């Protein structure tokens, strides 16, 4: 998989974490840098680990002969479904919750969000098990880009940018669908 595709894939799966970081950033009143680092670190670790787990699961099924004949469609379906769900979720109403900021790092919500936003990375990892790719490069890229975008997202949210999260999620969904379509196109044109 070329570097540009890995980069775009990483941005696509990082969009949910970015959006959550923007939302969480709007609630941070004190200790922004420390809390943004923790949030970004948790998101980055989950986004790096989940595609590895998904890839292992996918490789288990890739050895089955009939699956090898439709693997490109499986990758497209997984990426397409995840991308479509991201776009759908961006248009759903958000829960209004009152957040009291006491200045402490809140690990439990960050871990729950990290897990929730990395489910798409698990599905992407499963899809990538059916194509020729260095999963370690992909996982590292996903983790680092998610970390960086989550830091930026928390900063944007802290400084009043709550509207960016929705559009980042939509863009991420479009990117994932595009990559899935490209996998099918490359297979059919080979």
UniProtKB/Swiss-Prot annotation:
A Gene Ontology term for the protein's cellular component: plasma membrane
Sequence intervals crossing the membrane: 3-23, 37-57, 72-88, 111-131, 138-158, 164-184
GO molecular function: manganese ion transmembrane transporter activity
Any one Pfam family match given in the protein's UniProt record, by short name: Mntp
InterPro entries: Mntp/YtaF (IPR003810), Put_MntP (IPR022929)
UniProt keyword Iron-sulfur present: no
Organism: Corynebacterium glutamicum (strain R)
Name of the featured protein: Putative manganese efflux pump MntP
The entry's keywords: Cell membrane, Ion transport, Manganese, Membrane, Transmembrane, Transmembrane helix, Transport
Top-level taxon in the UniProt lineage: Bacteria
Protein family according to the UniProt entry: Belongs to the MntP (TC 9.B.29) family.
Membrane topology, from the record: Multi-pass membrane protein
Subcellular location: Cell membrane
Function: Probably functions as a manganese efflux pump.
Chief subcellular location: membrane
Keyword field contains Transport: yes
């Amino acid at each position: 998989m070329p570097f540009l595709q890995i980069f775009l894939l990483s941005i696509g799966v990082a969009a949910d974490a970015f959006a959550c970081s923007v939302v969480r950033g709007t609630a941070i009143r004190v200790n922004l840098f420390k809390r943004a680092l923790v949030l970004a670190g948790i998101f980055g670790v989950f986004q790096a680990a989940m595609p590895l787990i998904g890839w292992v699961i996918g490789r288990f099924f890739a050895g089955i002969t009939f699956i090898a004949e439709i693997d490109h469609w499986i990758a497209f379906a997984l990426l397409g479904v995840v991308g479509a769900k991201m776009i759908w979720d961006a248009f759903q109403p958000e829960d209004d919750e009152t957040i009291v900021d006491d200045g402490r790092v809140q690990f439990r919500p960050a871990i729950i969000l990290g897990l929730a936003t990395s489910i798409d990375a698990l599905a992407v990892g499963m899809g990538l098990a059916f194509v020729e790719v260095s999963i370690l490069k992909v996982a590292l890229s996903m983790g680092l880009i998610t970390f960086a975008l989550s830091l930026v997202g928390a900063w944007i949210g802290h400084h009043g940018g709550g509207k960016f999260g929705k559009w980042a999620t939509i863009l991420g969904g479009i990117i994932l669908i595009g990559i899935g379509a490209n996998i099918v196109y490359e297979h059919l044109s080979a």
